[in-house]
Amino acid sequence: MKKVVLFIITLLLITGCNKKQIEKFHLNNKYYNEGKFITIKNLDELKNDTYVLYTYNNYCTFKKPCEEVFKDYMKKYKIDFYGIPFEQFKKTSFYKEVKYAPSIILVKEGKIVTYLDANSNKDLDRYQDSKKFEEWINKYIYTEGLN
């Protein structure tokens, strides 16, 4: 009987600890603005900011340009995203974690919270479907009352 109880407790601890809790956050106020891309060359300027970063290349293999999906979201919620060419992005510390472009990277106080991985099958529909992208990003950032 003790072994069964111990097994159940262990199982509950393992499964309970594996679930990653998502904590929503606000972007810095200045990004709740017009819904435009802001080109940036030096991410060091944003050390402690909380923002959305779009890293891109000049070619796209998706049927629908993912930039259109992102723009739909930006216009709907009037949220500005920073944009940086992937060649410049490779020179940043974020490149250690994000290896492919295009990508949307959610940054909180200068640290990556999560990102879309162009090399991951689970993220592909988020690049092509505005609703799926919106569902994903709204799990992380507050948008209540913005649309």
Where in the sequence are the language-model features?
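Post-signal peptide N-terminal segment of mature Sec-exported envelope proteins
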Residues: 26-42
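Non-catalytic, surface beta->alpha helical segment in thiol-disulfide oxidoreductase systems
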Residues: 106-147
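Thiol-based oxidoreductase modules, predominantly thioredoxin-like and allied folds used
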Residues: 57, 78-91
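C-terminal motif of bacterial Sec signal peptides marking the signal peptidase cleavage site
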Residues: 13-16
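Structural micro-motif
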Residues: 95-108
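Local sequence-structure signature of Cys/Sec-based thiol-disulfide redox active-site neighborhoods
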Residues: 39-76
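Bacterial signal peptide processing site
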Residues: 18-20
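Positively charged n-region of N-terminal signal peptides that target proteins for export
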Residues: 1-4
